[in-house]
């Protein structure tokens, strides 16, 4: 049975999500920060975590963004195969939602229309949109405003199959060590393993939208997430890059089949707020 969705609903929801994600920390990230504050051994690290929480409190009370970099809007649309869109084109609707959200929410406009000419578009469009067709008649929207302090620290490694799991571990640690304080730690580390050059990067990005409380259903991946979180926190980078045990809140790993000749690994790093929002229409 075909279900009709008016794209005005897409506009409305994305507008609201842009504002909410930039003003309020998601429940999983709020809990992660509070847990880290309670367990952090470094006095300076604990002080920084308390300051980050005070910043969140002020943002909530005064309805201002939790960070001055309100990011480039990255949107995942999971569209049920039984959905028919009515109204403006879906891409146009997504960008209109971003436009309204960033304008009405007084969020910083951070997008330039050309990577070389670099003239600001003045409304934070276009968004980066990823589509997938899934069973059903619903539309799931996942929005992640991605700041570029952490985005610039992300890496892709085209490993050889012989590098194996140890090569993957080394790649993840290398990316985090190179990022250091520049990714505004404590960070969330999204990792994509497998696929192709572009697929592993997309996996790593999608991994960042997963709750930090949700672990991989695959046993070896779940064990790898745990091991890498321990190794990353042993680096001592700490909150704000000034030392401590809390360098990362979580390591989220996604995998995909790959070619016999390759082992692509992408590491997409996000800062201590790791903004993301989810809605289903």
Roles of regions detected by a PLM:
Residues 1-281:
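Non-transmembrane, aqueous-exposed alpha-helical and coiled segments at domain scale
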């Amino acid at each position: 049975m075909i279900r009709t969705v008016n794209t005005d609903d897409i506009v409305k929801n994305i507008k609201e999500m842009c504002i909410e994600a930039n003003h309020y920390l998601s429940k999983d990230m709020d809990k992660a920060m509070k847990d880290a504050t309670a367990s952090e051994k470094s006095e300076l690290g604990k002080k920084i975590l308390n300051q980050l929480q005070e910043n969140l409190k002020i943002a909530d009370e005064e309805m201002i963004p939790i960070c001055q970099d309100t990011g480039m809007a990255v949107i995942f649309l999971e569209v049920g195969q039984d959905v028919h869109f009515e109204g403006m084109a879906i891409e146009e609707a997504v960008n209109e939602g971003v436009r309204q959200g960033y304008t009405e929410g007084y969020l910083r406009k951070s997008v330039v229309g050309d990577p070389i000419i670099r003239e600001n578009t003045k409304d934070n469009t276009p968004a980066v949109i990823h589509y997938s067709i899934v069973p059903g008649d619903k539309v799931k929207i996942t929005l992640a405003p991605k700041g570029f302090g952490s985005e610039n620290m992300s890496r892709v490694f085209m490993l050889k199959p012989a590098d194996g799991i140890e090569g993957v571990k080394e790649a993840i640690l290398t990316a985090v060590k190179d990022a250091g304080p520049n990714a505004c730690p404590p960070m969330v580390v999204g990792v994509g393993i497998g696929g192709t050059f572009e697929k592993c990067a997309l996996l790593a990005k999608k991994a960042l939208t997963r709750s930090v409380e949700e672990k991989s259903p695959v046993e070896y991946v779940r064990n790898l997430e745990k091991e890498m979180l321990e190794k990353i926190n042993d680096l001592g980078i700490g909150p704000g890059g000034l030392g401590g045990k809390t360098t990362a809140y979580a390591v989220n790993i996604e995998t995909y089949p790959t070619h016999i000749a390759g082992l692509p690994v992408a590491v997409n790093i996000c800062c201590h707020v790791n903004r993301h929002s989810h809605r289903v229409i």
